[in-house]
Amino acid sequence: MKKILSDLEDKIKNKTSIICLTEDYCINPMWAHYADNHNGVCIEYDFKNISNFIFKILCFPIEYVEKSNNTLELSALFDDNIKTNPVWPLRLVLRKSHDWQYEKEWRLIVSQFFKDFFYEKNHGDVYFDEYYSDKHYIKFIKPKSIYLGLDIDLKDEEKLIDICKFRKINVYKMKKDKSGYNLKSEPILEF
């Protein structure tokens, strides 16, 4: 059983890429953990008005749970779920401990499982090759805004502002609020 589960895990890893997103760019620990301790950037996308089918089917909220029950979940992979629902095995990468729920995370999953499912089921006008390749690249939407970290390097800041000016992307700089504990953004460049 361990060998089967290990092989399945390898298959999922080799055929899947994940982009992690959050609903809130002002979470201090997120800047510390994922943006090089406030030296990096946060990129904002507007998914509300997206008409692109691929993003509607590939973006999932994280489920925050008290306790992982992967053994029961993995055993269920051997029934018909996997044949009829390509998202089912991806549930394994859509759960995290409830300790992380402050992240308000979503994951964009780019997986061969989806491609195989849609070709096999012939889902109308879905042409995966337009969005996806075997190298896990997808055409992504234009960022709405870039948020520069509190401690971003000045040269990096200038380069990003130049790029955003050319691409007509809003730029904001993160600052501490009056309390000194919370973050807020101040506009540098808006379109």
Please place each PLM-identified region on the residue numbering:
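Catalytic-core loop-and-flanking beta/alpha module that positions acidic residues
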Residues: 1-191
